[in-house]
């Protein structure tokens, strides 16, 4: 299970910042592509002393792959 440690605090209303969620989603897809079972990960915000579970949903996977494709277009 990937755990991403971040400096600072997460969003005031709870949850995670969108770039952090996408980064963790990409890490989970890489793990899956290499034969690991991975359906969730954690983001821990140091200053808030809390961690949030992030599920690898179909929507997150689609978003990550779309961003990857867009980055490849720009390269």
Where on the chain are the PLM-derived regions?
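Metal-dependent nuclease catalytic regions and adjoining charged, substrate-binding loops involved
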Residues: 14, 30-75
């Amino acid at each position: 299970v990937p755990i991403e440690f971040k400096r600072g605090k997460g969003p005031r209303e709870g949850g995670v910042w969108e770039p952090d969620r996408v980064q963790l989603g990409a890490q989970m897809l890489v793990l899956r592509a290499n034969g690991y079972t991975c359906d969730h990960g954690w983001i821990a915000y140091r200053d808030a002393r809390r961690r949030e579970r992030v599920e690898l949903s179909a929507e997150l996977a689609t978003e990550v792959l779309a961003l990857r494709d867009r980055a490849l277009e720009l390269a």
